[in-house]
Amino acid sequence: MSNTVFSGAVGPLRAAALSISRHRLPLLCAAGLGLTAVASWMWWRKRQGEAEDLQQVGIVSQLLIYPVKSCRAVPVQEAECSALGLKSGHLEDRHWLVVTEEGNMVTARQEPRMVLISATFCGNTLCLNGPEMQEVQIPLPLPKSNRVLDCRVFGQDIQGRDSGEQASEWLATYFQSSQPYRLVHFEADVMRPRQSKKKEKLFRDKDVIAYPDASPIMLLSETSMEALNSRLEQPVSLANFRPCIVASGCEAFAEDDWDDVRLGATRLKRVMACGRCVLTTVNPNSGVITRKEPLDTLRTFRQSDSSLKEVYKNAPLFGQYYGVEQTGIIRVGDPVYRVTRKG
């Protein structure tokens, strides 16, 4: 309201208007500061954009979250990419872990039938299902009175809150195991994540994970899968390789050269290739481990350069590990841009 309007106002109306103006002053100042911050950010982004080239190299075709390590994936259409990987509501990538009573991780390498377990969320309840098993429901959040276990994932120490006896009994029944297993949950607000570089030294200090093998993000292209399957007598699926992000619209193994990528609002930095192990030989439909294919075939054409043998040993390379450079939302259908510096 302008001063001209106020100039003809009677005393009480003018006083009330001035009082309102005084109350609005802090809000107007805050709004001004906010606009300044936004303008500064937009200027910085513009300068960054001027210094970089974006080349579309593919499309996000799938986003997959694995709530429990070594169990089935949950496909989502949209996910937040946090420093610890993909998340969508209660779904957080590999934030649940099966361990022994001593806290040692249990994966499909030891219990191949883990790949048949599905973990979904119904409201504030984690639901576990497996073949010939009744569903077990675990209310969330877990009670703070539940004990916190000291666990080990590839020799690294990390904590997890125990989910209780009902889940433990369900796992023992499913695996028909005389050894008791526990299901634990990583609570990011009170527990310290693992550092990726303690598993693979090529990672950066800031790359952190909960219970994944090494990286917050693993990306694989559909065309790389097709190239592998063209060499196999019995085709395998993406489920054998457990990527978080699947790309399409590119040449086979193009992801090997995507050192810096943008997907939606998210920016990822390629760290290293994913060296493959015996876990890839677990059939995701039967839960049977063969220890043969597709690993044997991968070894015939996806070995590392001799200069990198110290890093990868004899593991064939399939898919790429990424660190999270900038968090944000990723959606199925988003373009995948390779980012390069100008000049």
Swiss-Prot record:
The enzyme's E.C. designation: 1.7.-.-
Transmembrane portions of the chain: 26-44
Designated name of the protein: Mitochondrial amidoxime-reducing component 1
Annotated Pfam families: MOSC, MOSC_N
Residues exposed to the Cytoplasmic side: 45-343
Keyword Ribosomal protein: no
Entry keyword annotation includes Lipoprotein: yes
Function: Catalyzes the reduction of N-oxygenated molecules, acting as a counterpart of cytochrome P450 and flavin-containing monooxygenases in metabolic cycles. As a component of prodrug-converting system, reduces a multitude of N-hydroxylated prodrugs particularly amidoximes, leading to increased drug bioavailability. May be involved in mitochondrial N(omega)-hydroxy-L-arginine (NOHA) reduction, regulating endogenous nitric oxide levels and biosynthesis.
Catalysed transformations (reactions): N(omega)-hydroxy-L-arginine + 2 Fe(II)-[cytochrome b5] + 2 H(+) = L-arginine + 2 Fe(III)-[cytochrome b5] + H2O
PROSITE patterns according to UniProt: MOSC
Residues binding Mo-molybdopterin: K69, S70, R94, S215, R242, R276, C277, Y321
Places the protein is found: Mitochondrion outer membrane; Membrane
Mitochondrial matrix topology ranges: 1-25
Region annotation MOSC N-terminal region: where it falls in the sequence: 95-186
InterPro entries the record matches: MoCF_Sase_C, MOCOS_middle, Pyrv_Knase-like_insert_dom_sf
Organism this protein belongs to: Xenopus laevis
Membrane protein topology class: Single-pass type II membrane protein; Lipid-anchor
Cofactor note: Binds 1 Mo-molybdopterin (Mo-MPT) cofactor per subunit.
GO cellular component: mitochondrial inner membrane; mitochondrial outer membrane
Cofactors that this protein relies on: Mo-molybdopterin
GO-annotated biological processes: nitrate metabolic process
Comment block on domains: Comprises two structural domains, the molybdenum cofactor/Moco sulfurase C-terminal (MOSC) domain and the MOSC N-terminal region, forming a cleft that accommodates Moco. The MOSC domain, which contains a large seven-stranded mostly antiparallel beta-barrel, engages multiple interactions with Moco both pterin ring and phosphate group, allowing for a tight coordination of Moco within the core of the enzyme.
Domain MOSC: 181-339
